[in-house]
């Protein structure tokens, strides 16, 4: 999608109502989708010399964040009848500190299917030798330092044998690199299987 052309088209129709759901911070930065991990606050005034060009969305050649910031601010501001929607109060607060602050912001939390994600009987503990253990669970679609993978590794090293750290969503390559004291499970596309894993956990950890 050519974002600039899209917003030019929207602005040419001032009576159009626009509802834009933001799932990350990309809309108001010069490059990155997340900046908290690197403690960057350039997005409040203007991005330049980005330290995350190799992170999603990756840019391998040039750092164009300063120009991207200017283009986004020009494109996204001054839309006549636009409301923003975020899935969390946290993201809504960031929006209100950005160049999008003049738009109304509504929080609509992500929902879950309680017909699937509910206490579910399974043999997960037995199959993985977790009976009698206190299970600490971490789940991610893609594990990285920003998602807290190094912190889970340190946590597992500090716990005694009565605990077991279980990580869901790791890749085959990561499994080879992660210490054996962590139970690693590759990403599953089965919501029912994920519900069984959640039910088997004693503690869910989100870093």
Where are these regions (language model features)?
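Membrane-proximal helix-turn-helix segments that form the acceptor-binding/catalytic region
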Residues: 12, 42-84, 98-99, 103-104
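Conserved donor-binding/catalytic core segment of Leloir-type glycosyltransferases
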Residues: 130-147, 153-157
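Acidic anion/phosphate-binding donor-loop and adjacent secondary structure
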Residues: 93-96, 112-127, 175-178
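Glycosyltransferase donor-sugar binding loop
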Residues: 139-142, 153, 164-177
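Nucleotide-activated donor-binding/catalytic signature segment of Leloir-type glycosyltransferases, i.e.
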Residues: 169-203
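A short beta-strand/loop micro-motif in the catalytic core of glycosyltransferases
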Residues: 19-23, 77-89, 106, 205
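Charged active-site motifs of nucleotide-sugar-dependent glycosyltransferases
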Residues: 104, 130-137, 163-164, 203
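Conserved nucleotide-sugar donor-interacting segment of glycosyltransferase catalytic cores
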Residues: 1-50
